[in-house]
Amino acid sequence: MIEFVYPHTQLVAGVDEVGRGPLVGAVVTAAVILDPARPIAGLNDSKKLSEKRRLALYEEIKEKALSWSLGRAEPHEIDELNILHATMLAMQRAVAGLHIAPEYVLIDGNRCPKLPMPAMAVVKGDSRVPEISAASILAKVTRDAEMAALDIVFPQYGFAQHKGYPTAFHLEKLAEHGATEHHRRSFGPVKRALGLAS
């Protein structure tokens, strides 16, 4: 992996998203400015960490970061805007929520939202840039907790297991029970289920 070269600036925020692919729930983003004086060991892409390790790092990031913030776009916004534009909006919200304004923002992936400060997209940034890794962890732990809470209300769909992704089980239950108000109506499988359910 090519080592990432940081921009010449002090306050760098990392931004990542979780939940572009699921059929249900919000897309959740996080923005994090780490404190160089309080390093956090073991930051890595949240998908490569065990749940136990993610939860421990989640608490450590919130405690040690100079600033952190969550952003989100709800299912109705995803349906109105499309998933790409809703993700960009959620990233803008996460950056706007930082109580310290970053001088530069590094975004995981290959697209940047419009921001009031310079920004750069970093491909595979969640495994190359600690700030993005930290954002990835905050976003994933937050969204996973939301899916676990939704699972209590709608146990028949198995949200706690598949986190809303279009698994065979989820698609089967969607066809059987129809969509909840938390499903993204613009996504093909949900559209089809609504057709079946009506």
From Swiss-Prot:
Residues 10-198 form the RNase H type-2 domain. Manganese or magnesium. Binds 1 divalent metal ion per monomer in the absence of substrate. May bind a second metal ion after substrate binding. It catalyses: Endonucleolytic cleavage to 5'-phosphomonoester. It holds the Pfam family RNase_HII. A divalent metal cation binds at residues 16-17, 108. Its EC number is 3.1.26.4. Its cofactor is Mn(2+); Mg(2+). One of its GO terms (biological process) is mismatch repair. GO terms for cellular component: cytoplasm; ribonuclease H2 complex. HAMAP family: RNase_HII_B. Belongs to the RNase HII family. NCBIfam families: PRK00015.1-1 (NF000594), PRK00015.1-3 (NF000595), PRK00015.1-4 (NF000596). This is Ribonuclease HII. The lineage of its organism: Bacteria, Pseudomonadati, Pseudomonadota, Gammaproteobacteria, Enterobacterales.
